[in-house]
Amino acid sequence: MADVKKVVLAYSGGLDTSVILKWLQDTYNCEVVTFTADLGQGEEVEPARAKAQAMGVKEIYIDDLREEFVRDFVFPMFRANTVYEGEYLLGTSIARPLIAKRLIEIANATGADAISHGATGKGNDQVRFELGAYALKPGVKVIAPWREWDLLSREKLMDYAEKHGIPIERHGKKKSPYSMDANLLHISYEGGVLEDTWTEHEEEMWRWSVSPENAPDQATYIELTYRNGDIVAINGVEKSPATVLADLNRIGGANGIGRLDIVENRYVGMKSRGCYETPGGTIMLKAHRAIESITLDREVAHLKDELMPKYASLIYTGYWWSPERLMLQQMIDASQVNVNGVVRLKLYKGNVTVVGRKSDDSLFDANIATFEEDGGAYNQADAAGFIKLNALRMRIAANKGRSLL
């Protein structure tokens, strides 16, 4: 496999990608550049540097991408009120296009002719990484070891690591109970007991949130300030995008918000059960719909809702860098010009309740909407003609004998 001289590897420092690093060196006889992304996963990323150095890697990239992640990926997604299959807030999906982008940037900077990732051949991530890579660098070679090697169990990986002197932490022979992925938007949990769709998840699994039952008995109130569809302040204090999300995770988690247990349809064809912890995102979704409720035109809001499932599917299936997603994003962003104002929320035992919203760009007119005397602002007699015109097609059909009874 002499055609590959240098590979950029998406490297976490864990067992899988450490084995991949050594496997690439031996199988392709190539130089490996490692790239470790800090997306707010809450783990120290610097140990990955020491591991890579110990394995002979000379070019090591460890990048703090938290602000870019929230500003350029999470926030644009939430402008669309994006939810996949009615529940999933796409915490894993939205991180992959940024990682793919950075892999390609590093490949260009280092003269690498290939990239590699640790996604398995059963999951969505292989598709997300590779669609992004090919969109950004059409001629790049992608090496996906899980589709090539025979190391198809954790024990085989451990044995390979020990045989090749790869530093690992072996805790007996017991398999880790969950496969986890974390970033500033969420933590996902898969595998283990969760593979039985009838078995309830364990309370000890959750890392960011208390159970709703153990959340404080006193409600927490917060105010979120929006500018062009993005949160710019919490309780009147301006914050950067990453800090906004981190603070909402902390506040939401303390109130038992953001837990989810679902079975989703993977792009590769199978159903998969996952548990997700997304406290900040859960708050953001509720708040964004609230500020839009007073600032968006009715038909614009309805059109956004119609297009949202397609937009969500594009993100879930790895088409972030596609022309259709970019086209939808331009439309979504155009709709956010007047999405400005403040939303007040009540957080209590797993629930997020909107209790107030205000905006200088509000389309809500109390003089027209009032149940009291409106001083002629709205002529109720006009409704008769409106109703008759909208009933015309149904009246014609009924007169032609098309009875519905």
From Swiss-Prot:
Gene of this entry: argG
Name of the protein: Argininosuccinate synthase
Native source species: Pseudomonas putida (strain GB-1)
This protein's UniProt keywords: Amino-acid biosynthesis, Arginine biosynthesis, ATP-binding, Cytoplasm, Ligase, Nucleotide-binding
Reaction(s) the record says it catalyses: L-citrulline + L-aspartate + ATP = 2-(N(omega)-L-arginino)succinate + AMP + diphosphate + H(+)
The keyword Lyase is annotated on this UniProt entry: no
Binding site for L-citrulline: 88, 93, 124, 128, 179, 188, 264, 276
Enzyme class label: ligase
Annotated residues for binding of L-aspartate: 120, 124-125
Chief location category: cytoplasm
Entry-linked PANTHER family: ARGININOSUCCINATE SYNTHASE
Any matching Pfam family: Arginosuc_synth
